From Swiss-Prot:
Keywords: Nucleotide-binding
Source species of the chain: Shewanella oneidensis (strain ATCC 700550 / JCM 31522 / CIP 106686 / LMG 19005 / NCIMB 14063 / MR-1)
Keyword Nucleotide-binding: yes
Gene Ontology CC, one term: cytosol
Name of the molecule in the record: Nucleotide-binding protein SO_3815
Amino acid sequence: MPSFDIVSEVDEVELRNAVENSRRELSGRFDFRGKDASIDYKDHVVTLTAEDDFQCKQLVDILRTQLSKRNVEPSTMDVDEKSVHSGKTFSLKVRFKQGIETDIAKKIVKMVKDSKIKVQSQIQGDTVRVTGKARDDLQAVMALVRQADLGQPFQFNNFRD
Protein backbone atom coordinates (compact mmCIF):
# COMPACT_ATOMS: atom_id res chain seq x y z
CA MET A 1 0.00 0.00 0.00
CA PRO A 2 1.44 3.38 -0.94
CA SER A 3 2.17 5.76 1.93
CA PHE A 4 4.07 8.92 2.80
CA ASP A 5 4.90 11.03 5.85
CA ILE A 6 3.96 14.66 6.41
CA VAL A 7 6.74 16.40 8.35
CA SER A 8 7.75 19.94 9.22
CA GLU A 9 11.47 20.42 9.61
CA VAL A 10 14.02 23.13 8.97
CA ASP A 11 17.18 22.32 7.03
CA GLU A 12 19.97 22.90 9.56
CA VAL A 13 22.62 23.65 6.94
CA GLU A 14 20.49 26.22 5.12
CA LEU A 15 19.56 27.83 8.43
CA ARG A 16 23.23 28.16 9.38
CA ASN A 17 24.01 29.60 5.93
CA ALA A 18 21.22 32.16 6.30
CA VAL A 19 22.59 33.22 9.70
CA GLU A 20 26.11 33.58 8.25
CA ASN A 21 24.78 35.65 5.32
CA SER A 22 22.86 37.83 7.79
CA ARG A 23 26.08 38.44 9.73
CA ARG A 24 27.83 39.45 6.51
CA GLU A 25 25.02 41.81 5.58
CA LEU A 26 25.06 43.26 9.10
CA SER A 27 28.78 44.07 8.85
CA GLY A 28 28.21 45.91 5.56
CA ARG A 29 25.10 47.87 6.48
CA PHE A 30 25.61 51.62 6.89
CA ASP A 31 22.94 52.02 9.59
CA PHE A 32 24.75 49.50 11.83
CA ARG A 33 28.24 51.06 11.49
CA GLY A 34 29.75 51.73 14.90
CA LYS A 35 26.83 50.02 16.64
CA ASP A 36 27.04 46.99 18.88
CA ALA A 37 24.88 44.46 17.02
CA SER A 38 25.28 40.71 16.57
CA ILE A 39 23.52 37.60 15.34
CA ASP A 40 24.31 34.34 17.16
CA TYR A 41 23.07 30.82 16.40
CA LYS A 42 22.98 27.91 18.82
CA ASP A 43 20.66 24.86 19.07
CA HIS A 44 17.94 26.06 16.67
CA VAL A 45 17.78 29.41 18.47
CA VAL A 46 19.05 32.63 16.87
CA THR A 47 19.83 35.45 19.30
CA LEU A 48 19.69 38.95 17.84
CA THR A 49 21.43 41.62 19.92
CA ALA A 50 21.46 45.37 19.24
CA GLU A 51 21.64 48.72 21.05
CA ASP A 52 18.04 49.63 20.29
CA ASP A 53 14.69 47.82 20.06
CA PHE A 54 14.17 49.20 16.55
CA GLN A 55 17.51 47.75 15.46
CA CYS A 56 16.44 44.33 16.78
CA LYS A 57 13.40 44.51 14.50
CA GLN A 58 15.71 45.39 11.59
CA LEU A 59 17.84 42.35 12.41
CA VAL A 60 14.70 40.18 12.27
CA ASP A 61 13.96 41.59 8.80
CA ILE A 62 17.53 40.90 7.66
CA LEU A 63 17.28 37.31 8.92
CA ARG A 64 13.86 36.82 7.31
CA THR A 65 15.21 38.06 3.96
CA GLN A 66 18.21 35.76 4.11
CA LEU A 67 16.01 32.78 5.03
CA SER A 68 13.87 33.47 1.97
CA LYS A 69 16.94 33.59 -0.24
CA ARG A 70 18.09 30.21 1.14
CA ASN A 71 14.64 28.63 0.53
CA VAL A 72 13.87 28.27 4.24
CA GLU A 73 10.26 29.18 4.91
CA PRO A 74 10.17 32.29 7.16
CA SER A 75 6.91 31.07 8.71
CA THR A 76 8.97 28.56 10.71
CA MET A 77 10.34 31.48 12.73
CA ASP A 78 8.92 32.02 16.20
CA VAL A 79 10.10 35.49 17.28
CA ASP A 80 9.76 36.69 20.89
CA GLU A 81 7.09 39.34 21.38
CA LYS A 82 9.26 41.75 23.36
CA SER A 83 12.98 42.23 23.31
CA VAL A 84 14.87 41.67 26.55
CA HIS A 85 16.73 44.76 27.82
CA SER A 86 19.94 44.08 29.71
CA GLY A 87 22.46 46.83 30.30
CA LYS A 88 22.77 48.85 27.13
CA THR A 89 21.65 46.12 24.72
CA PHE A 90 18.33 44.66 23.62
CA SER A 91 18.10 41.04 22.55
CA LEU A 92 15.49 38.96 20.76
CA LYS A 93 15.37 35.18 20.57
CA VAL A 94 14.16 33.54 17.37
CA ARG A 95 13.21 29.87 17.63
CA PHE A 96 12.44 27.60 14.70
CA LYS A 97 9.53 25.17 14.65
CA GLN A 98 10.65 21.57 14.29
CA GLY A 99 8.10 18.81 13.90
CA ILE A 100 4.32 18.96 13.87
CA GLU A 101 2.64 19.74 17.17
CA THR A 102 -0.19 17.41 18.20
CA ASP A 103 -2.98 19.97 17.78
CA ILE A 104 -1.85 20.80 14.23
CA ALA A 105 -1.46 17.07 13.50
CA LYS A 106 -5.04 16.52 14.69
CA LYS A 107 -6.22 19.31 12.37
CA ILE A 108 -4.43 17.63 9.45
CA VAL A 109 -6.00 14.24 10.25
CA LYS A 110 -9.46 15.82 10.60
CA MET A 111 -9.01 17.77 7.35
CA VAL A 112 -8.04 14.57 5.50
CA LYS A 113 -11.04 12.68 6.94
CA ASP A 114 -13.44 15.52 6.09
CA SER A 115 -12.21 15.58 2.49
CA LYS A 116 -13.65 12.05 1.96
CA ILE A 117 -10.49 10.91 0.16
CA LYS A 118 -10.03 7.16 0.62
CA VAL A 119 -6.87 7.24 2.74
CA GLN A 120 -5.98 6.58 6.35
CA SER A 121 -3.92 9.07 8.33
CA GLN A 122 -2.33 8.54 11.71
CA ILE A 123 -0.18 10.62 14.02
CA GLN A 124 3.27 9.15 14.72
CA GLY A 125 5.13 11.41 17.11
CA ASP A 126 5.87 14.63 15.26
CA THR A 127 4.90 13.26 11.83
CA VAL A 128 1.63 12.25 10.19
CA ARG A 129 1.61 9.03 8.14
CA VAL A 130 -0.89 8.85 5.27
CA THR A 131 -1.68 5.48 3.68
CA GLY A 132 -3.97 4.74 0.74
CA LYS A 133 -4.59 2.28 -2.08
CA ALA A 134 -4.06 4.66 -4.99
CA ARG A 135 -1.17 7.00 -5.60
CA ASP A 136 -3.62 9.61 -6.96
CA ASP A 137 -5.39 9.72 -3.59
CA LEU A 138 -2.08 10.40 -1.85
CA GLN A 139 -1.29 13.19 -4.30
CA ALA A 140 -4.73 14.69 -3.62
CA VAL A 141 -3.92 14.69 0.11
CA MET A 142 -0.60 16.41 -0.63
CA ALA A 143 -2.40 19.14 -2.56
CA LEU A 144 -4.95 19.49 0.25
CA VAL A 145 -2.26 19.93 2.91
CA ARG A 146 -0.28 22.38 0.74
CA GLN A 147 -3.25 24.69 0.27
CA ALA A 148 -4.28 24.58 3.95
CA ASP A 149 -3.02 27.51 6.02
CA LEU A 150 -1.92 25.93 9.31
CA GLY A 151 0.85 28.36 10.22
CA GLN A 152 3.87 26.31 9.22
CA PRO A 153 5.24 24.70 6.05
CA PHE A 154 5.06 20.95 5.51
CA GLN A 155 7.29 18.56 3.59
CA PHE A 156 6.37 15.14 2.28
CA ASN A 157 8.93 12.38 2.54
CA ASN A 158 9.27 8.62 2.89
CA PHE A 159 7.00 8.08 -0.14
CA ARG A 160 6.57 4.33 -0.64
CA ASP A 161 4.75 2.34 -3.27
